[in-house]
Amino acid sequence: MLSITKLSHVYANGTRALDDVSLHIPRGMFGLLGPNGAGKSTLMRCIATLQSPTSGTIAFGDVDVIRQPEALRAKLGYLPQDFGVYPRVSAFDLLDHLAVLKGIAQRGERKETVEQLLQQVNLWDVRKKAVAGFSGGMRQRFGIAQALIGNPQLIIVDEPTAGLDPEERNRFNNLLVEIGESVVVILSTHIVDDVTDLCSRMAILAGGRIVASGQPRELIDAMQGRVWASAIERGELDAYRARMNVIATRLREGRTVIHVEAARTPGPGFMPITAGLEDVYFATLTAQRSGAAAVALA
């Protein structure tokens, strides 16, 4: 169990990236959803001991993460959003080097570990090729391989499927599901479908605060009967936003389709639709922004 209690972080320029964040994350896949700038990466860096929070506590089992960073690192696998690699170094040699840094000193044990990981992430056939020349999906799978060195009990993946094509994204997600059966995996993303497909529990982070949390199915069920859709002309969008709680827009066959949250039909031309996690996400962000705007005007 990863327990985060009243965690806040304020940067030197006064930006409050995290504001009183509390979460309890059990074994399995946990999705952390939020827009760019919500504070997701800051939270991931605090958990990964890459920066210290301004206040609050983080505990993983009996490890005080802030006071015992080395103890946490021994149990941690981390795939950041972006990571660099040495040029002209093969996947096998780079993974072997990273295993040394992780503390696997015996050559035979390292060889066995590296071979097993490359096969697990389906990179065995390209083990002699330089990682710098890998495609985006192959590079992310290598990133997961290095995160799995040492059999970590806590794995953090930050925006792992951004930029991947659908086939690579599906392959990568299947790998995450396999890994998440026995350890705590935190998936930080702004891609709603990843959380829908993978995670048994989730939270939404916006403006540095947790604005919703729970099981995806429970959050979706709570929205049922409250989402309505209608196709409109693009030029009508501002007028609808002024009169209704428009939570999402999308294009369908060249026309703008709006989703509106309301207890009853918001007007002619609207049809009730089955809510999805994307509706939950956008409705939550809309409510958070409206609340923030009201506070700013007060």
Regions of interest found by a model, annotated:
Residues L2, A17-L18, R73:
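Conserved structural motif at the start of ABC-family nucleotide-binding domains
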Residues P35-G39:
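Walker A (P-loop) phosphate-binding loop of ABC-type ATPase nucleotide-binding domains
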Residues A48:
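Helix-to-loop junction immediately C-terminal to a conserved catalytic motif
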Residues G56-R67, A71-L72:
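Conserved ABC transporter NBD signature motif
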Residues D96, V100-G103, G108-V126:
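Conserved ABC ATPase "signature" region
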Residues I155-E159, L164:
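Catalytic Walker B motif of ABC-type/P-loop ATPase nucleotide-binding domains
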Residues R171-H259:
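ABC transporter nucleotide-binding domain
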